[in-house]
């Protein structure tokens, strides 16, 4: 069958057109009229000659209402407006009944230019001109204008082209060359159409015809085949038009040049404009393209080359449509919009792609204010698209362009019976090519470039039935230096709801929000999609990149980019030197992936750096990575994901029909290759990544670096609620917040298949994340958190099985695993469902978790792992805060770092579980903490049984909860750790369990980890922890070695409230170790433990050892207490119950099947204020069967000589240790009423056994054993409870007969629990009297029997005031059980005070006691200590010195010679005074020193110029220090001195020769002072812990008279004065009597010291004048003999003994020397500064005195 082709017809003009010379340019033609095609005329169409035409438009010119479209007279009614045309004629067929008028398809109804000349329209300068072309409908190309040459529109005021139609192309304008519009004020192209009429369906299929046959039959075949589309839209039909464009036949006689072959363009394209050359619209104000349409491509514009819009104020392209591509514009070349203000592409549509723009070349948006592409559509949206059989296709539908499926093979707008294409289609009719419908807003086959947009680039509300709802870019997309790039509310039926790209997308230097919001895609990439494994989205210098509320039905709700998404900021300028600036934000929020991975973004690498903030929040994914999916190993392949969907759609719903047509119809070769290459490149991506540049983070698929604020919150997914990655690194972030994310399986916040690294963060917060199985906050194979500057917070994260149903574990039923596999099958790339560890890691899950070098407060609080699943399976619930499958390491070298674990929990809603509930805060097989840490109120719990039948104690498979704070296998803690308020069944604070993840030793691959808890090199506090069964610490092996260790107020139901162990435990103190206030709550054990009988009594033990069945039946658990650098103390550890237990069973420190060893270093103590009540599994009646209790045994050449104390000071202490005790070194102290029961006891030489009154040392009834005492010390600091005839309760050495039924193996069932060990040294052979035999029930007593009275209380007992026999030791009543030899009494036998007497030892024990004879001598109240008494007497010299210093100030300052030269004024003086006196020791006195300081105030007047009179008041505060000859006491004394003085001076002359007038000048100065001095002294006696206090007063007088004679007086030329003087100085100090208080007081009588001195000396004085300031200086030297003095003698009496004596004061020698210096500085007429210094030097004394102050004259 030959194909039919519609051939173009040539219009024949009736009149000959005037010829235009080709050798000259045409004259411009005025265009100032309007034409309306209303009558027969030949002048409607302007025909252009060969040279072209230039039209000068003035006024309003218009061409309207013309058509050459034929109509059928018999079938088509004519319109009243279409009966004639303006000035044109036509040749019409005469047979109106059967013939249809058919024109040649000629174009250019208004202007026709068939030549290459230029056709231009313009206005003259300064005039206005508008051109309107409307309602012109033509069968040919260019409804209004056809131009073979260049077409120009220049400087028109208005250009309106509307309602025009072409039945070929170019509904308004068709240009064979370039088309240019410039300088247009307003250009409007509206309602123009390029519509190819639909062919008429033939009743019968015609045979193939030749060209001539076709010509001959065309008249009969054309009538039924033409149906005007315009008539269906109520446009004029013009059936009877008379025009030269209409001929009688449909087929021309000959073809033109353009018709000899298939046209290069597509008929039905370019609804308004069709340009074969470039189309340029520039320098215009308003340009509007609206409601234009085309049945092929380019609803408004079709250009075979470039399209350019430049410098346009307002460009609006809206409501245009195309049946195929380019709803507004189709450009085969490039499209450029530049230097314009407003550009709008709105509500355009196409059915096959490019709803607004379809460009085969590049698109360039540059230098624009704003450009908006909105509400455009690509595809068919009116009806569901289905593929129909060709026999059913309708060919006569007038609306075929709107309803035909784009999936049809022709690609055109009509479908014929035979499937043939319309004329001009270049598609092969033998192939069916599917419609693409790509790019709802724009489509480009090459690149899209956006530059320098200052307002906004908005691509919004566009739709596409294929990919790229907003835009389709096959090449690169580059956007730079622009403002507000936004893709809003676009949608796609496939990938890329906002934008679909097949090459790299680069965004740089964008301001405002770069926004992808509310875009949707039915496949991948709701907001953005990039095809290809090597294409990336790269962003640099963006203010804000936002993916908000985008949705995809497969992967990448916000964006799908296979290779990489990166955003960073770079700057060449450093705002602050050395600091790289940050700028911009990333916002990924509210995006959804309803059927796949990556709710926010899905990419193989996400790199964000140098940004101000990042927010990934509110995103969701049906599979993995709610916020971001970056894992390359499980990365989904977009095309691979399409194929199963397409295949299934072929047999499913009608909605899938378009996809079926695309996938199963004959595809283009490019489609096939893209599928193949994408799958191949996806598989090859790991190898490619290895060849990348050597970036240290190259293998990191998620990188967030150098960001101020990062938030990942409220995202949801199956895995990785916030982020799903392979390797993730977040570094150098000021604030990182991961909160309120959720995942149904693993990784609520972040999930990484391999590693997660958080480094150099200032603040980290991971809060309120939720997961169904593992890792509420973080989940990774390796988690490394390091170098955090201000700590972090993990709070209220939760792993809760109830959120997902059943978590798969090794013990989970197969049905649960099958359901999970079925869910995973929704994504083909999903791996097989893994076996999960259970509900683990409320905050963090990892195989290896490491925290290092973090500073500040690092907090885990309120995190939970919960199994609330009602299924029958029992899950492991472990690690409320952290679960590390292999190891956890936490370390910090910063002393300010503190890790806090508070309120974390693991729990199950079941009362019985076979799953292991462990680690309220931490679970890991290997735990290493080397940092300060606090664990408080963490819990591991099960639901309370409702009935007794639900109690898991009866079933061996039911497991107890372990480790309220920490659970693991090998746990090591160092630093400072505090555990408080934690709760679990076993190990309320720390518990161990066998590691299920480690292969057993039998596997041969590796050895299992040994269960052990190690606390070392730090301080550890355990307080108020609660164990529902046993132990704040629970482990087979425990090693504690720390500075300060405290177990306080921990509780447990059974023994072992502090520590429960089954193999060995070592506690070594480097500081203080304290077990206090730990409580056991149950009287009887409710169930049997290994090696125990049912209902065994609890003792309230803080430490409990039970080897169970883990060791041989005869082996006890080993406990070693080692006080190496600190003390170990057990006190108030108790059994508290309401059953009225006796005190003997209320307090206990250690119990269980324990082999005990005690070692204390020198000066250190192990104190048991609670009893030790251990048992043993050894059985036998001889002592050598039992273990040895080594006390202070030397180890590794380290001697242990400390003290072991058993005390009943707080409550009764009866300790039972079934071992052979050997005291190797040091001291064992049994305090008052304390009992120690051992199998045997041996005291080695050099050790010390101290027993207080009432103490008992005994063997046990389970075996024969001796008590060998080699030196016993009895502490008499207390009396005990003496019986009649006893001064104190003597200690007892007790022997107990062995019972035949004794069995150590019975443990606590025996009345005396046991745990003995064999003595290491067997009894040597030799004399029975001197060689003890350890297997005998006998007491061996030898060596020194030492009595000590450390407090001196014993000898104050009045019973010692007479002679008597004193029992010292209680012994067995059977003398055969006692052997005493070589015993010597020693110690405190001669007291320093109290009842004095002598002791005589009776070494033969009688009637069960050893006693001594006391003979009374005398009684002494005070301990004697030699004292000297010089201190009190020597204080007199200090009092005298305090008065002399005041006198010296008055003489040298107030009464200075210079003052007598002054004018008579009144003076006020203020002085500061000080003195220091030191005296060496003399034969009569000890050394002492005195210093004092004070103030003096004086006022004086000069009644005459030669006379001064004044008064002064002074106060001194001093201290006296004595350097004693005997150093067993010292004095602390103080002194307060108050003095009042009167002084005066007179200057006179002594007449030597009256006749000659010779006279000597004399100066008389005098001072009288009275002083009252108070003393307060305390004397301390450290050696005897005593003191004295003494308070007394001194009264003093001092009188001084100085007479000076001038040898040289000042003259007019000199101020120098030389003086000799003599002085009389008298002082008297009287010390009042006083009595000491406190220790052995004494009474001292009065004593007095009087001294009269006669200083004689000379002085030199003079003035210095400088800068109007006068300084007057004086220097004096004197010899100072004492002409009278007494030696003060003080008598005293000791009150206790009436002993009397006297003290002679060590006074200075009689001769001494004195030097004085004084100065006065005159600052003016009213102010003077002054000062003086005096030094007295004697043989044994040195006294220095000074004063300085100011004088005011008034």
Curated annotation (Swiss-Prot):
GO cellular component, one term: extracellular region
Chief location: secreted
Comp. bias (Polar residues): 252-264, 402-412
GO molecular function term, any single one: ubiquitin binding
Any one GO biological process: double-strand break repair via homologous recombination
Places the protein is found: Secreted, Cell wall; Cell outer membrane
Domain Autotransporter: 1461-1754
InterPro entries reported in the protein's UniProt record: Autotransporte_beta, Autotransporte_beta_dom_sf, PbH1, Polymorphic_membr_middle, POMP_repeat, WDR48
Coiled-coil ranges from the UniProt annotation: none
Gene3D superfamilies to which the protein is assigned, alphabetical: Autotransporter beta-domain
Signal peptide: 1-14
Membrane topology: Peripheral membrane protein
Keyword terms: Cell outer membrane, Cell wall, Membrane, Secreted, Signal, Transmembrane, Transmembrane beta strand
Family designation: Belongs to the PMP outer membrane protein family.
Designated name of the protein: Probable outer membrane protein PmpB
Source organism: Chlamydia trachomatis serovar D (strain ATCC VR-885 / DSM 19411 / UW-3/Cx)
């Amino acid at each position: 069958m030959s194909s039919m082709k519609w051939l173009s017809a040539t219009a024949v003009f009736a009149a000959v057109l005037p010829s235009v010379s080709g050798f000259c340019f045409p004259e411009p033609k005025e265009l100032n009229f309007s034409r309306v095609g209303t009558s027969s005329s030949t002048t409607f169409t302007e025909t252009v000659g060969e040279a072209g035409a230039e039209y000068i438009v003035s006024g309003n010119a218009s061409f309207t209402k013309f058509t050459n479209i034929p109509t059928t007279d018999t079938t088509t009614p004519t319109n009243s407006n279409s009966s004639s045309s303006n000035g044109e004629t036509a040749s019409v067929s005469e047979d109106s009944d059967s013939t249809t008028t058919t024109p040649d398809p000629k174009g250019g109804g208004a202007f026709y230019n068939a030549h290459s000349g230029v056709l231009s329209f313009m206005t003259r300068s300064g005039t206005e001109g508008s051109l309107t072309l409307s309602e012109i409908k033509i069968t040919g190309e260019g409804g209004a204008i056809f131009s073979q040459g260049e077409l120009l529109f220049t400087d028109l005021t208005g250009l309106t082209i509307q309602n025009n139609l072409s039945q070929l192309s170019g509904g308004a304008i068709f240009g064979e060359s370039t088309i240019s519009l410039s300088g247009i004020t307003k250009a409007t192209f509206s309602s123009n159409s390029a519509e190819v009429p639909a062919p008429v369906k033939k009743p019968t299929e015609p045979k193939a015809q030749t060209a001539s046959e076709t010509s001959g039959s065309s008249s009969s075949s054309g009538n039924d085949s033409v149906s005007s589309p315009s008539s269906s839209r109520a446009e004029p039909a013009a059936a009877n038009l008379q025009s030269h464009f209409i001929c009688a036949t449909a087929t021309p006689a000959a073809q033109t040049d353009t018709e000899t072959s298939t046209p290069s363009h597509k008929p039905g394209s370019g609804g308004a404009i069709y340009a074969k050359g470039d189309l340029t619209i520039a320098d215009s104000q308003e340009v509007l393209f609206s409601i234009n349409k085309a049945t092929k491509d380019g609803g408004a514009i079709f250009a075979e080359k470039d399209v350019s819009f430049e410098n346009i104020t307002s460009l609006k392209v809206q409501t245009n449509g195309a049946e195929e591509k380019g709803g507004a514009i189709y450009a085969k070349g490039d499209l450029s919009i530049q230097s314009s203000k407003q550009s709008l592409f709105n509500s355009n549509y196409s059915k096959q792609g490019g709803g607004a723009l379809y460009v085969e070349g590049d698109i360039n948006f540059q230098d624009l204010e704003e450009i908006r592409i909105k509400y455009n559509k690509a595809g068919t949206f009116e009806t569901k698209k289905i593929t129909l059989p060709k026999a059913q296709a309708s060919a006569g539908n007038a609306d075929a362009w709107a309803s035909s499926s784009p999936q049809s093979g022709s690609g055109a707008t009509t479908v014929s019976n035979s499937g043939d294409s319309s004329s001009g289609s270049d598609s092969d009719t033998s192939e069916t090519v599917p419609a693409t419908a790509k790019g709802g807003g724009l489509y480009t086959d090459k690149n899209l470039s956006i530059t320098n947009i200052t307002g906004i680039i908005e691509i919004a509300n566009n739709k596409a039935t294929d990919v790229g709802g907003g835009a389709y870019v096959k090449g690169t997309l580059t956007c730079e230096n622009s403002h507000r790039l936004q893709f809003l509310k676009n949608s796609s039926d496939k990938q890329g709801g906002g934008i679909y790209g097949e090459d790299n997308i680069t965004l740089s230097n964008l301001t405002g929000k770069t926004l992808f919001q509310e875009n949707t895609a039915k496949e991948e990439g709701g907001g953005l999609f990039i095809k290809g494994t090597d294409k990336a989205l790269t962003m640099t210098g963006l203010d804000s990149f936002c993916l908000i509320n985008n949705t995809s039905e497969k992967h990448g709700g916000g964006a799908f980019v296979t290779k990489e998404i990166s955003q960073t900021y770079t700057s060449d300028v450093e705002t602050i030197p050395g600091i790289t600036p940050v700028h911009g934000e990333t916002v990924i929020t509210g995006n959804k992936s309803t059927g796949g991975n990556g709710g926010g973004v899905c990419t193989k690498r996400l790199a964000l750096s140098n940004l101000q903030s990042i927010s990934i929040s509110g995103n969701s994914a049906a599979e993995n990575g709610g916020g971001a999916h970056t894992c390359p190993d499980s990365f989904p392949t977009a095309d691979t994901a399409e194929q199963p969907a397409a295949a299934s759609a072929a047999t499913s719903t009608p909605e899938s029909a378009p996809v079926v047509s695309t996938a199963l119809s004959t595809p283009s070769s490019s489609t096939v290759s893209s599928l193949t290459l994408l799958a191949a490149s996806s598989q090859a991506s790991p190898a490619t990544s290895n060849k990348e540049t050597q970036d240290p983070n190259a293998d990191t698929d998620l990188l967030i670096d150098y960001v101020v604020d990062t938030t990942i919150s409220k995202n949801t997914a199956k895995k990785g609620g916030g982020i799903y990655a392979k390797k993730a690194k977040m570094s150098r972030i000021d604030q990182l917040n991961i909160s309120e994310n959720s995942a149904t399986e693993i990784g609520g916040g972040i999930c990484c298949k391999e590693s997660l690294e958080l480094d150099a963060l200032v603040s980290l917060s991971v809060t309120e994340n939720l997961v169904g199985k593992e890792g509420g906050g973080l989940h990774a194979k390796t988690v490394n958190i390091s170098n955090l500057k201000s700590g972090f917070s993990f709070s209220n994260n939760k792993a809760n099985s109830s959120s997902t149903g059943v978590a798969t574990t090794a013990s989970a039923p197969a049905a649960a695993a099958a359901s999970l596999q079925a869910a995973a099958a929704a994504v083909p790339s999903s791996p097989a469902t893994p076996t999960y560890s259970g509900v683990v890691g409320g905050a963090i899950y990892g195989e290896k978790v490491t925290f290092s070098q973090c500073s500040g407060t690092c907090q885990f609080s309120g995190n939970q792992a919960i199994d609330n699943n009602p299924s029958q399976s029992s899950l492991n619930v472990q690690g409320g805060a952290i679960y590390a499958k292999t190891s956890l390491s936490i370390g910090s070298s910063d002393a300010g770092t503190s890790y806090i674990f508070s309120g974390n929990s693991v729990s199950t809603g079941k009362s019985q579980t076979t799953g292991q509930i462990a680690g309220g805060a931490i679970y890991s097989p290997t735990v290493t903490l080397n940092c300060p840490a606090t664990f408080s109120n963490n819990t591991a719990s099960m639901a309370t049984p409702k009935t007794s039948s639900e109690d898991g104690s009866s079933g061996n498979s039911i497991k107890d909860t372990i480790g309220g704070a920490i659970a693991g296998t090998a746990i090591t803690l160092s630093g400072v750790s505090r555990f408080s308020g934690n709760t679990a069944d076993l190990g309320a604070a720390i518990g161990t369990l066998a590691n299920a993840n480690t292969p057993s030793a039998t596997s041969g691959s590796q050895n299992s980890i040994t269960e052990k808890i190690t606390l070392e090199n730090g301080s550890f506090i355990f307080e108020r922890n609660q164990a529902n069964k046993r132990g704040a610490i629970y482990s087979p092996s425990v090693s504690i070695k720390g500075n300060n260790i405290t177990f306080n107020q921990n509780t447990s139901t059974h023994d072992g409230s502090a520590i429960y162990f089954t193999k060995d435990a070592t506690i070594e103190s480097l500081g203080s170790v304290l077990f206090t206030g730990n409580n056991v709550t149950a009287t009887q054990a409710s169930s049997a433990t290994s090696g125990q009988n049912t209902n065994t009594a609890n003792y309230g033990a803080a430490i409990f050892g039970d080897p169970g069945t883990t060791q041989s039946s005869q082996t006890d658990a080993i406990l070693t207490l080692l006080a190496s650098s600190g003390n170990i103390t057990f006190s108030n550890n108790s059994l508290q119950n309401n059953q009225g237990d006796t005190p003997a069973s209320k307090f206990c420190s250690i119990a269980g099947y324990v082999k005990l060893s005690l070692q204390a270093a020198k000066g250190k103590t192990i104190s048991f204020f609670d009893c030790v009540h251990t048992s043993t599994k050894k059985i036998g009646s001889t002592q050598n069967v039992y273990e040895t209790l080594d006390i202070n045994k030397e180890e590794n050449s380290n001697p242990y000589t400390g003290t072991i104390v058993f005390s009943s000071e707080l409550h009764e202490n009866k300790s039972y240790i079934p071992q052979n005790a050997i005291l190797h070194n040091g001291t064992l102290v049994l305090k008052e009423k304390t009992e120690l029961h051992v199998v045997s006891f041996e005291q080695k030489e050099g050790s010390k056994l101290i027993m207080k009154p009432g103490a008992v040392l005994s063997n046990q009834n389970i075996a024969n054993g001796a008590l060998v005492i080699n030196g016993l010390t009895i502490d008499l600091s207390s009396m005990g409870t003496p019986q009649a005839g006893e001064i104190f309760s003597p200690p007892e050495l007790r022997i107990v007969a062995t019972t035949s039924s004794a069995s150590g193996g019975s443990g606590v069932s025996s009345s005396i629990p046991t745990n003995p060990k064999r003595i290491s040294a067997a009894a040597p052979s030799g004399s029975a009297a001197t060689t003890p035999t350890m297997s005998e029930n006998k007491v061996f007593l030898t060596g020194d029997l030492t009595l000590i009275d450390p407090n001196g209380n014993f000898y104050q007992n009045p019973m010692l005031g007479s002679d008597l026999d004193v029992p010292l030791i209680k012994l067995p009543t059977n003398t055969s059980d006692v052997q005493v030899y070589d015993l010597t009494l020693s110690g405190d036998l001669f007291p320093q005070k109290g009842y004095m007497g002598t002791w005589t030892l009776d070494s033969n024990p009688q009637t069960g006691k050893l006693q001594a004879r006391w003979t009374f001598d005398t009684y002494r109240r005070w301990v004697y200590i030699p004292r000297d008494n010089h201190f009190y007497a020597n204080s007199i010299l200090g009092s005298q010195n305090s008065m002399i210093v005041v006198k010296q100030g008055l003489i040298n300052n107030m009464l200075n010679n210079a003052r007598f030269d002054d004018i008579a004024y009144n003076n006020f003086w203020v002085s500061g005074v000080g003195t220091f006196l030191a005296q060496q020791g003399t034969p009569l006195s000890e050394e002492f020193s005195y210093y004092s300081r004070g103030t003096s105030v004086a006022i004086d007047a000069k009644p005459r110029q030669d006379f001064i009179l004044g008064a002064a008041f002074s106060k001194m505060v001093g201290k006296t220090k004595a350097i004693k000859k005997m150093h067993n006491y010292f004095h602390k004394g103080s002194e307060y001195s108050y003095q009042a003085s009167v002084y005066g001076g007179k200057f006179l002359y002594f007449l030597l020769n009256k006749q000659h007038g010779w006279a000597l000048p004399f100066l008389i100065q005098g001072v009288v002072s009275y002083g009252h001095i108070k003393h307060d002294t305390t004397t301390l006696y450290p050696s005897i812990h005593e003191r004295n206090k003494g308070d007394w007063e001194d009264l003093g007088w001092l009188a001084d008279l100085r007479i000076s004679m001038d040898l040289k007086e000042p003259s007019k030329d000199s101020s120098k004065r030389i003086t000799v003087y003599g002085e009389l100085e008298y002082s008297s100090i009287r010390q009042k009597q006083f009595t000491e208080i406190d220790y052995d007081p004494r009474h001292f009588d009065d004593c007095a010291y009087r001294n009269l001195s006669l200083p004689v000396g000379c002085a030199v004085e003079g003035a210095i004048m400088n800068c109007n300031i006068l300084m007057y200086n004086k220097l004096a030297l004197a010899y100072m003999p004492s002409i009278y003095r007494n030696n003060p003698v003080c008598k005293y009496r000791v009150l206790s003994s009436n002993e009397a004596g006297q003290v002679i004061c060590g006074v200075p020698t009689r001769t001494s020397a004195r030097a004085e210096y004084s100065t006065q500085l005159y600052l003016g007429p009213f102010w003077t500064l002054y000062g003086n210094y005096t030094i007295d030097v004697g043989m044994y004394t040195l006294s220095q005195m000074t004063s300085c102050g100011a004088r005011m004259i008034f």
